[in-house]
């Protein structure tokens, strides 16, 4: 009888722990996504402190998380390209740098696909092509045409965008 009582107590405890874990997991999965505007404001604040690459990485995480629920957001896409460009340009880690430029190119392509008539996507796509070209001679030769095309598009759309830095 003592063994039966111990078994029942153990099973009850196991059931209680398991149901608490399931409830905690369900409540964390049900949390509503933050509005993209809030995430963008947070990311812009983090970018203002970009001298600390940890802030850039935090911004990238927030933007990626938001993009998972708002894949069609132009403002998220071009900012992802911008943050990736900065990380790629300043990271001392070659692997992180290469991934940042690659991710930045993909984000820039998405931004251009979403809003072809706006300069930000073209600018940051071209910047990431340029960053990638700078670190890889093979990539650089193949991306010259893309860099030129994107920067010419920026100049056509808004000659003064980013203080005219599209004039290379």
Name the predicted role of every residue range.
Residues 24-29, 34-65, 80-160, 164-168:
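Short coil/linker segments at helix-helix boundaries
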Residues 69, 73-75, 83:
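Glycine- and aromatic-enriched membrane insertion/assembly motifs of diderm outer-membrane
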Residues 10, 66, 71:
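Short, flexible active-site loop motifs that bind/organize anionic cofactors or intermediates
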Residues 16-19:
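C-terminal motif of bacterial Sec signal peptides marking the signal peptidase cleavage site
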Residues 1-8:
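Bacterial N-terminal signal peptides that target proteins for export
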